[in-house]
């Protein structure tokens, strides 16, 4: 089955692929992503050349100085990527490929099988799933990415899909709730036949 990527997914995938191609030259960009809470942060200016190189569609640019929903979505996904990749030099030795990646919430569902983690994970997931505030969601997703890294550093997260979800989340209340339902299904639905990346 062929699944077509959206423009947001393609842009995110292209940026991450470019980061891999740059080898050691990406460390400043990854560090800036980790330190920046948003694209508006002064530290994020290091990221702008690469980000704006790929976000070229006229309709994705804001008419003023506000960040667009595309920029926020892609930047947040890249920030999660940078957080997960910190200290993983061996990970960047391989070509970036998201075909075998799982969504962020599917990766969390694998961790949820551990009863020691379940209650704390459920509380954090519920906080994300119950809000329509994009600022709260972006902060929580970075924290959840850190939890995945701490408990399964071999996990592969589909960052382009995450960026697309974040884009859709910002399109209004109903769209945000649809994304929350998608994430909830990925998190709570247990499929014992599907293997996690750590197996």
What does each model-identified segment do?
Residues 97-169:
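Conserved binding-pocket/active-site segment within a compact domain
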């Amino acid at each position: 089955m062929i699944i077509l990527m959206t423009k947001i997914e393609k842009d995110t995938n292209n940026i991450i692929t470019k980061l891999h191609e740059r080898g050691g030259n990406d460390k400043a960009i990854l560090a800036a992503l980790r330190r920046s809470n948003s694209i508006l942060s002064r530290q994020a200016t290091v990221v702008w050349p690469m980000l704006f190189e790929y976000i070229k569609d006229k309709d994705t640019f804001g008419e003023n100085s506000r960040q667009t929903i595309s920029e926020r979505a892609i930047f947040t996904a890249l920030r999660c990527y940078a957080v997960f990749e910190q200290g993983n030099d061996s990970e960047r030795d391989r070509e970036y490929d998201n075909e075998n990646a799982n969504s962020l919430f599917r990766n969390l569902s694998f961790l949820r099988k551990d009863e020691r983690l379940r209650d704390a994970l459920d509380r954090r997931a519920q906080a994300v799933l119950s809000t329509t505030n994009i600022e709260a969601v972006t902060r929580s997703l970075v924290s959840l990415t850190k939890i995945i890294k701490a408990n399964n550093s071999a996990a592969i997260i589909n960052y382009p899909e995450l960026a697309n979800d974040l884009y859709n989340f910002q399109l209004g209340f109903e769209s945000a709730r649809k994304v929350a339902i998608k994430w909830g299904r990925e998190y709570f639905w247990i499929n014992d036949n599907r293997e996690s990346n750590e197996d």
